[in-house]
């Protein structure tokens, strides 16, 4: 006898769709598969490790350029609703500062830290930012770009902006 069943691999939207199927009597199993790593009760979702490795590889390349030119790079990664990518990639790459929506970000403290690092002889600086944060009252979605300009103005460190965005969704699958 043939029985219909669904194995749903994805995030919140996929699981909402699977729930709809179960309401019609179709059995479903959900496997967390999202680079955002924001599925409740899941340590790490399918795709997160690949996204992390992609970000780390790209930031390593940016850091090489930052080091040779004594530069700062504000790196924006996906994470509008959850800052796991920015947080873990920031830690993995030794970022000077990390901005995620879950933790209040003090821009002045970040700038002071960059100045102190510059004065101590550091040659490269990475500021990792999750997309869409922190939004001001007007809902400014270009915060990361503007942060890069303010860092350059206030520290004297040449600062570039890199939005990694959807390229982080690609890459050869990896597993930690």
Language-model region placement:
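Conserved small/polar residues in nucleotide/adenosyl-binding loops
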Residues: 1-5
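Accessory alpha-helical/coil subdomains and C-terminal extensions
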Residues: 8-10, 20, 27, 47-157
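Short, well-ordered, mixed-charge alpha-helical segments that flank or form enzyme active sites
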Residues: 14-18, 36-40, 81-85
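Short gly/pro/ser/thr-enriched loop/turn and capping motifs at secondary-structure boundaries
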Residues: 15, 34-39, 105-107, 135
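Acidic/polar active-site rim loop that often engages polyanionic ligands
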Residues: 31-44, 67-68, 93
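Catalytic, metal-anchored helix/loop core of enzyme active sites in primary metabolism
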Residues: 141, 167-176
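Acidic-glycine-rich active-site phosphate/pyrophosphate-binding loop
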Residues: 153-167
């Amino acid at each position: 006898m043939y029985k219909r069943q669904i194995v749903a691999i994805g995030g919140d939207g996929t699981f909402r769709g699977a729930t709809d199927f179960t309401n019609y009597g179709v059995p479903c199993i959900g496997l967390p598969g999202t680079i955002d790593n924001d599925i409740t009760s899941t340590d790490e979702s399918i795709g997160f490790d690949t996204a992390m490795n992609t970000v780390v590889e790209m930031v390593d390349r940016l850091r090489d350029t930052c080091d040779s030119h004594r530069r700062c790079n504000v790196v924006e990664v996906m994470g509008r609703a959850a800052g796991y990518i920015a947080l873990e990639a920031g830690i993995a790459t030794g970022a000077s500062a990390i901005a995620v929506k879950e933790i209040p970000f003090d821009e002045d403290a970040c700038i002071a830290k960059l100045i102190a690092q510059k004065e101590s002889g550091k040659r490269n600086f990475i500021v990792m930012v999750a997309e869409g944060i922190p939004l001001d009252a007007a809902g400014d979605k270009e915060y990361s770009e503007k942060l890069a300009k303010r860092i350059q103005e206030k520290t004297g460190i040449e600062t570039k902006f890199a939005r990694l965005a959807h390229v982080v969704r690609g890459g050869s699958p990896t597993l930690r």
